[in-house]
Regions:
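N-terminal targeting leaders
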Residues: 2-178
Length: 178
């Protein structure tokens, strides 16, 4: 009788803990969606910035790169105000000022968004391909529809005076499976 009672108590405790964990996961998912909206509606975010956020138990970690220091501060403040956020840890880096990098950003963005295959992205309020340039090294980040678009974007970003190109673009299918 005691064994059955302790097994039942253990099962009840495990169910309670797992449902609490499940509820916290759901809150974190909802919070991540709210944070995503807050980031994408930040008017000063451009295709030359890339911000990512992770959420665990209401604690938000911001990562990525921005072109100006005030953007880092603004984003931290915006995320802190999102309902449900307990704390924010910012690991956002500010890209160094460089005329060479600025010119390279313009060349790469014209090459990609000037290509007819990417015109549908170019007209979006927040185009999905982000072009991060640091010290002549180009990183493509964001989401595209297919692997063909990912390969084309990388090809278009090559041969414009860059030292290297890192293609961190993901397809819609890859993002959905995460």
């Amino acid at each position: 009788m005691k064994v059955k009672a302790s097994i039942a108590a253990t099962v009840a405790l495990l169910v309670a803990l797992s449902s609490t964990a499940f509820a916290q996961d759901r809150r974190d998912i909802r919070l991540a969606e709210d944070i995503g909206r807050s980031i994408t509606t930040y008017a000063r975010l451009t295709i030359f910035d890339d911000i990512n956020a992770t959420v665990e138990n209401g604690v938000v970690v911001l990562t990525g790169r921005v072109t100006m220091p005030y953007k880092k501060d603004d984003l931290e403040k915006r995320i802190t105000k999102v309902d449900g956020v307990r704390s924010v840890r910012s690991e956002i880096g500010v890209l160094p000022v460089s005329q060479f990098d600025d010119e390279l950003r313009r060349r790469v963005s014209r090459a990609i968004y000037g290509n007819p295959s990417f015109w549908n992205y170019a007209v979006m309020a927040n185009p999905p391909i982000h072009i991060i340039v640091e010290g002549g090294h180009v990183t493509l980040a964001g989401v595209v529809n297919s692997n063909v678009e990912r390969m084309l974007a990388r090809s278009l970003a090559t041969g414009l005076g860059e030292l290297s190109v890192t293609n961190s673009l993901k397809t819609d299918a890859e993002v959905k499976s995460e």
